[in-house]
Amino acid sequence: NDIPIINTEKNPYLNNIIKAATIEKERLIGIFVDGDFFPGQKDAFSKLEYDYENIKIIYRNDIDFSIYDKKLSEIYMENISKQESMPEEKRDYHLLQLLKKELSDIQEGNDSLIKSYLLDKGHGWFDFYRNMAMLKAGQLFLEADKVGRYDLSTNSGCIYLDADMIITEKLGGIYIPDGIAVHVERIDGRASMENGIIAVDRNNHPALLAGLEIMHTKFDADPYSDGVCNGIRKHFNYSLNENYNSFCDFIEFKHDNIIMNTSQFTQSSWARHVS
């Protein structure tokens, strides 16, 4: 009967969300959830919405993502055709056989990129549906009928935050010059784009659509590295000849009122959850 969101001393994710909702009372705070919830858990979600007017539980089942889908069989057949169109000496026969096997293994009723991630239930599942949600952006709330007194248009933007990102004060107006920004981690002087924060100023941002296009063409595409990072690189015409750290500086979401990635200082709650 508890709210099914991790809330431990080391990883107070639910508390972080409630704190954000309390500070940002004029913003809608969506919690995008998926899973087979017990009736008591759904009741607990409803009570959370009642206690905090701007918190909205958005169930994955209530959102139609079909416009972003593609048949798995089409992805595999396109890659098979690509291999078979090559001169024999350049074909990867091991890959070709693997693609044909994967094609033959697709079960009836599961010929869908989106459904394949529903069967995954790992990090890929999280990453993929995060991308889908950010393509919808503010439209998520409208489609789930979770707007309340708040004013949203169909092309409203959205900020995604991992639950270990702590809002300390009101964020105020947020200016994203190129319409998209993401979290950037820096380790030993090397920067890398991360999906712990994704901010867009509208739905269907072309950088995320570019990532979706990669997901629709690569048989082994990854929702994080391809769906986000490579999509952003493609949209902004990033070249490997350019300085990657400088590109990360350009695309980074920066804000003084957010403490970033606090779970890096604790044992991973995800690792404990799946072990």
What does each model-identified segment do?
Residues 138-141, 173-175:
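Single-residue recognition of alpha-helix boundary sites
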Residues 125-140, 147-153:
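Solvent-exposed aromatic/hydrophobic patches embedded in short alpha-helical segments
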Residues 140-148, 157-164:
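Short beta-strand-to-loop acidic/aromatic patch adjacent to the donor-nucleotide binding site
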Residues 120, 138, 155-157:
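A generic hydrophobic-helix recognition signal that picks specific residues
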Residues 1-128, 159-275:
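Glycosyltransferase-associated regions of secretory-pathway enzymes
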